[in-house]
């Protein structure tokens, strides 16, 4: 195979982005999909469906981050690619979703071409990456990277507008 043959399906990638951008419409063509709200749950379910259709095994960690794993030839640490599906209160249409869905398109392209990688690939959707609901931003990725302790992260105060919810009860 030449490098010219290793090409993503741009139409499929665009259609996937546009389908996800229909969930949580905001103002001026943007999105409003705050972490762990109904619209976030809806796009997460769609992402999970797409990943499973691509042959990935989807797991969710204690912070609610999603990991869609495509196995490799060897049992090695995975290559992670992704971003987030949540948005700011008035978020951009492509912020975050492009990183997550580009990872999914990589997996789909490898599948289309019958390529098995040496290492597993995991497409990640980090929970609360934007930090619009729970401070600080990137708290779930921070727990994963060892920057924050899990108990500390789960004890983050809930914003006033969501006083009936807490991060631990939402993640469960």
Regions found by a protein language model. Name each.
Residues 7-91:
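Acidic/His- and Gly-rich active-site-bordering loop/insert found
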Residues 163-169:
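Conserved small/polar residues in nucleotide/adenosyl-binding loops
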Residues 141-160:
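A glycine-rich helix N-cap at a beta->alpha junction
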Residues 92-94, 132-139:
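Short acidic, glycine/serine/threonine-rich loops at helix termini
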Residues 17-18, 44, 48, 100-108, ...:
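Predominant activation on well-ordered alpha-helical scaffold segments within soluble catalytic domains
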Residues 81, 93-127:
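Alpha-helical metal-binding/catalytic segments enriched in His/Glu/Asp
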Residues 85-87, 124-132:
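Acidic, glycine-rich active-site loops and adjacent beta-strand->loop/helix elements
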């Amino acid at each position: 195979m030449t490098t010219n043959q290793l090409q993503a399906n741009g139409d499929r990638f665009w259609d996937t982005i546009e389908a996800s951008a229909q969930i949580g419409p905001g103002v001026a063509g943007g999105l409003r999909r705050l972490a762990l709200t109904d619209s976030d749950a809806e796009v997460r379910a769609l992402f999970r469906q797409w990943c499973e259709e691509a042959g990935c095994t989807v797991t969710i960690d204690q912070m609610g981050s999603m990991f869609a794993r495509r196995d490799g030839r060897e049992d090695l640490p995975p290559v992670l690619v992704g971003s987030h599906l949540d948005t700011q209160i008035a978020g951009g249409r492509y912020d975050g979703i492009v990183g997550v869905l580009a990872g999914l398109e990589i997996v789909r392209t490898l599948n289309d071409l019958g390529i098995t990688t040496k290492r597993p690939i995991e497409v990640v959707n980090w929970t609360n990456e934007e930090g619009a609901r729970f401070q600080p931003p990137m708290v779930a990725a921070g727990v994963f990277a060892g920057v924050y302790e899990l108990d500390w992260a789960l004890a983050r105060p809930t914003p006033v507008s969501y006083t009936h919810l807490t991060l631990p009860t939402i993640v469960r």
